[in-house]
Each structure stands twice: as C-alpha cells, then as structure tokens.
Amino acid sequence: SYDFTDKAHFDKYYADFIAGTIDPTYNYFRQYRFGVANVDVTGDPRWKAPFSAGQLGFYAQDKWNVTPSFQFTYGLRMEIPLFFKTPTANEPFNQYAAAHNWGVRTNHKLSSTPLWSPRVGFRWDINKDRKYILRGGLGVFTGRIPYVWISNNFVKTGLQMQTYSVNSPKGLDLILDPNGQEANAARLRAAGSQEVNVFEDNFKFAQTLKANLGFDFNLLGIDWTAEAIYSKTLNDIYYKNLSVDKTGQTFGQVTGYDWDNRPMYERTTTGTPYSYVYALYNTSKGYTLNLSLKAEKHFNFGLDLMASYTWTRSMSVNSGTSSVAGSNWMFNATYRDANDPELSLSAYNVPHRIQASAYYHTNYGARKQWETTVGLIYQGRSGSPYVIEVYGDMNGDGANGNDLMWIPTDAQIDKMKFASNVRVNNSKDIYPLITKVLGPGFNGTLTEDQQRSLMKQWVGDDSYMRDHRGEYFKRYADNLAFEHHFDVHLAQKYSFKVGGQLNSLELSFDIINLGNLLNKDWGHTYGDGFGRYFSPFNYEGNGVFKFDGTHVARNYDTYYSRWRGQLGLRYTF
C-alpha cells in the first residue's frame, strides 16, 4: 500500500510523473508497505493459506400443549465446528511468547467441542379468543462461525508471509500492479518483518443469551404488538496487540495537557522480527435491548395500514467490523486501554427507527381477475453511529486511527499548541466553518489563534460536543442526522386459469426514495446504519495539533441519496 502524506504530496507526484521529472530525493509517500510470500518456506511466491473448515448442526424440538390455550416449546441445538488443518508452528515465536507469558502459540488448533444451545418458549392465549396473546422465550444462540477471523491465524503465522514497511521512503515509484511490487521492495534495506495472528489458548466461539417477551392484543379495532428483546453476550471477541504495552505514563503527563489521562504505550518487540502480534480473545461484556410497538389496521374495502416504532441500545467492546485482525484492533477507537477496551455503544447502534405503510388493494372485472395495488412506505431512522477521533498516534501504540477525541473546553483550547504553516484555500467558500469564523474567501496560512477560533466554533456548533465538553467522545456516542425515506409501490395483476390451476401475471413499479425525486434536498442518506469514523484534526506529535476547519462530518452520501426506479414482472403458476 502507498500512503501519501496529504493531497498536496499526491498532486506533486502526479504532476512530476506526467512531466517525467520524478525526484528520487523527495518524500512523496508517508508510508509504503508490501507483503510477500517467503518462498524459502512456501516454495510458491503466490502461496495461499491451507485453511479448511466445516460445521455440523443438530436440532431437536418438542411442543407441549399444557392446556388448549397454553403451549410450551423446548428444544436443544448443537453445533460442532470442524477444522481440518492446523496453523503452522513458528517455533522461535512460540518460544518468545512463552518467555513473555503471553499464553499463545501459532500452531494452536481450535477444538471441535460441541456448542450447546438450549431454548424454551411459551404462548398463552389468555382469553382463549386470540384477542390477547402473551408469548416469550429464552435461549442460547450460536449462529454461523465467522471463519474469516479464524483464517487470519493460518495466513499470518510469521513464517509464510513477510511485510516490508518504511516511513517517508525516497526513490520509490508508484507501481499499481500488485504482482510487480518486488522492484520497490528490493530497494528497501530493512529485512521483512513478521505480523503474527494468534488465539488465546482457551478461545471460544461467540454465543449470546437471548430473551424475548411479546404481547399481541386488539384494542379499539386495531391489532397491536408490544415486544421486548434482550441479548446478553456470553462469548464475544476482542483483540489485543501483544507487541505494545503501557509505559505507566499518561498523555497528560507527557504533554502537559493534564485533562487527558489516556495511557501511553511503547513497543515491546523492538529488536525482534515481530512487528505486530494480534491475539484474538473472548469477552462476556456487551448486550442489546430492543423495545418495539406496532399497530395494524385492516379495512374490508382493501386498505391496510401499519405503523411501528423500535428503540435500540446496543453495547459492545469490539464490534468486529473488519475481516482482518489488525484492522479490528487498530480501528476500535478507545480513550482507555487499547488492549482492554471499554464497554461502549456498538457500531450497529441505531437508537430510533420508525416504519409506516399504507396499501390499497382493489379487485375488479367480471370474475375479479384484475387486481390493482398502490402502496406508500415510510422509513425513518437515526443516522449511522459515528466516532470522532484524532488522526495521528497520540498514545504511542502504533495506530493512527484509534484515539478518541477529548472534547475540550474553550479554556483548554487556549492552552493547546497548534501547528504552523497550515495552508487553507477557501476562496470559493466551500468550507462553511472557515467562512463563518474567518470570513468569505479566505486563502492563506492559518495562525495558531485562528485554529483555536475554528476549533471553538466547531465544538460549539455541534449539539453533542457542546453538551459534553470536558469529556472524551465515547465510541459511537452520537448518530448522524435522522433520515426520512418514502417509497411508492404500484402493481397490476391479472389472474387466469390454466388447466384448472390459478395463474397470475403481475407488473410492478417501485419508486425508491420518492422524496429525492420530488426535491434534490430531500431523502438524504447519512450512512448505512453502520459505524462511521471521522478525523477532523491531526496530532502532529510533541503535544501539537493541526485543525484546518475543512472537515464536514455530517455530510450526506450523494450516491445512496438518489432516487431509483425498479420495474418488475412476475408470473405465478
């Protein structure tokens, strides 16, 4: 991978490349990394991990009619994970890990111990007329095993693959062919380093305990459903980077910013070939609670109405948002211990969701063979959860994207040091914050005081940060703007008999995101319900920050905010 320092460095490389004047002494790139198979071990430069696995599942269930109106269901599910290969033993690493009491080894094979999931449920027709039904259940759920996380440990034992990494490289060309990187790697003087992925010895697969209680009832001629679902983590995953450890100091002690007490780290594998050691561990922390209420009304003239509201709170230690071990660790933003992250809102926490629909059906014709359906669907929900982090390695753990922001007070901003020579071009007023604070058409170098003014205004303009000054921006503590989306469904169906069997032909047309069709400023999508990361300012090192005011965290997605039309044809026989 090639990491340019910033857009200015990319623009310079592009201009020099077009002109044929690449400067071998210029630092175009911030970092260059290249992974290659160790052919002395693999015998094949395009080696792939010999990973194979399977899963057996068995389920037994019985229903007991305690009374005609009360049913009790109980069952037992069993999953057996199967692993047909074992990761390669890296004996030098295993000895190093044992000497440091890490409790890990590269050739640890996960067991095929059965995973038991007992479940019970009930259904009670209270008045025996189906007007008031109480139902619920309790059980353990395993689900499908995320084999992609497991496969990392087969690929990265530290033997088959080597990684070359250099900061601020000089004399490297931008080679786009992934199979042609050897030319650049050959120019690097350092030996290839080893990233190692391992399990803790007693690693268990993820399981949750889930309970639900629902009440279906009819009131005022409307069918209602109230339901609560609670899921408690029994075993979930999180990652540790064993190649770093806390120094015993805090960021505040090192920089003089005494309000920020996040721990500082140092590398523990200096002088070894092990650049990163990511270990997969279990945690029992985490839960999800859903509360919902739904109302439905069906009219005998063909109109069906529905509306529902769901409130959600989802907490986790690590949301497991990546398929790669290193990313799951380094992008799990934290303000505390990166190897023991705090329980916080998850990347999937969408607290409010509203749904409503109105469908009208009408049949006509001599034999009622024609049916027309018109539907209007509304979906409203909280935007994607997000975090605000500082780009740069504030705590020395080697990761540039996992340090949650401290939300400073104005007095603390006055004490912060800011970088010099920060250029900003807002001559066309494309950055609202800069226009608001520095006036229209600003184009020049920001002073420290101007950066302080921009940061004060930015914090003050954000509703969440304004109310949480003097705190860390907790992981996924806020959500992007609430979204409103309307869809339209139109369908025309014709029914007929063929050989005594009823057949039908249906033509349908759906308008998805109707609001955006009517007005380009309506129907905006601010995310996909999945956690987002924003890094509006940088940490330059030695207690110095850079804030240029150009970041717009709450911008909408221009692609998914567009309206779409969908034409369908269905034949049923």
Question: Where is each model-derived feature located?
Answer:
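C-terminal beta-signal and terminal closure region of outer-membrane beta-barrel proteins
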Residues: 519-573
